[in-house]
């Protein structure tokens, strides 16, 4: 009976092999995205005609240069860039290492989870927790407004790194406890990430070319994840494993807290940004 039960629980990888399993999963994802693309092509509104067109390549380049200059001339843009980058800096360190930590055997400082368990905890319970956290984070900001909610949001966003440090040091054998830590991570990520998104929308993007400037801010947030992710593997090996790596990740959260405590707000977070406030925001323009 145990053999039959195990056979039924086999994942795609066990049935067809690793390479073929990846091919099947990627093909299914590609087909799903293709169908969604056709659906959106037919159902979404066109958005109307563009209000302005570049007459030449030179004009397009000048407009692009004006967009970049406008972004870097915004008031407090230096501290805003630092805040956006460091908001997710610790996440960038941890996000590449956590799957390895969960899958590594106990004698290698890991938790010894199977791929099936990791997929279930992340792909099902984690996604649900992320959606719930995002919704509650939005209500939390609406209640307190962004200025007052920002520091609590960063705190909640970074608490999961404490959880992973504890998991690394104590290596609990309970799947329920480990799953709870992963669910809490995704809930906190959804709850806290709303604050960064709204900060970029309210304080960085307003003004001429606000869609482009919002894209710049979002790119900086992704840069704050990519850069530490590039060194996370080397850092984990250099520190001697997961124990000290997650402790180091906790130290990496400090700049975000320091910046959040003193971050200036260019625009009020209680009402729509007025046109005259946008004009005052730009320096030397």
Q: What is the role of each PLM region?
A:
Residues 96-119:
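Short amphipathic helix-loop junctions that connect adjacent transmembrane helices
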Residues 30-50, 259-264:
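C-terminal membrane-cytosol helix-exit motif in multi-pass small-molecule transporters
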Residues 132-151, 236-237:
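Helix-to-loop junctions at the C-terminal end of transmembrane segments
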Residues 48-80, 279-285:
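Juxtamembrane intracellular "pre-TM" segments in multi-pass secondary transporters
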Residues 147-196:
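C-terminal transmembrane helical hairpin of 12-TM major facilitator-type secondary transporters
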Residues 1-8, 12:
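Single conserved hydrophobic/aromatic residue that forms the stacking wall/gate
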Residues 207-238:
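A late C-terminal transmembrane helix in Major Facilitator Superfamily
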């Amino acid at each position: 009976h145990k053999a039959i039960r195990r056979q039924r629980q086999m994942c795609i990888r066990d049935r067809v092999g690793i390479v073929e399993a990846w091919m099947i999963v990627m093909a299914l994802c590609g087909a799903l995205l293709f169908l969604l693309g056709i659906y959106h092509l037919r159902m979404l509104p066109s958005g109307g005609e563009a209000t302005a067109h570049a007459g030449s390549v030179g004009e397009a380049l000048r407009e692009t240069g004006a967009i970049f200059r406008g972004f870097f001339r915004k008031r407090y843009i230096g501290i805003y860039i630092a805040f956006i980058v460091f908001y997710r800096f610790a996440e960038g360190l941890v996000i590449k290492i956590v799957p390895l930590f969960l899958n590594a055997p106990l004698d290698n400082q890991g938790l010894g989870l199977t791929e099936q368990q990791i997929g279930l905890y992340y792909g099902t319970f984690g996604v649900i927790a992320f959606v719930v956290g995002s919704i509650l984070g939005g209500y939390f900001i609406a209640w307190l407004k962004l200025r007052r909610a920002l520091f609590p949001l960063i705190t909640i966003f970074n608490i999961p790194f404490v959880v992973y440090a504890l998991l690394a040091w104590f290596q609990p054998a309970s799947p329920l406890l480990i799953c709870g830590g992963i669910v809490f991570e995704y809930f906190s990520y959804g709850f806290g990430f709303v604050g960064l998104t709204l900060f970029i929308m309210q304080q960085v993007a307003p003004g001429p070319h606000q869609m482009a400037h919002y894209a710049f801010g979002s790119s900086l947030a992704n840069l704050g994840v990519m850069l530490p992710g590039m060194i996370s593997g080397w850092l984990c090996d250099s520190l001697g494993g997961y124990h000290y790596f997650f402790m180091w990740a906790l130290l990496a959260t400090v700049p975000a807290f320091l910046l959040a405590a003193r971050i200036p707000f260019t625009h009020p977070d209680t009402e729509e940004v007025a046109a005259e406030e946008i004009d005052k925001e730009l320096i030397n323009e």
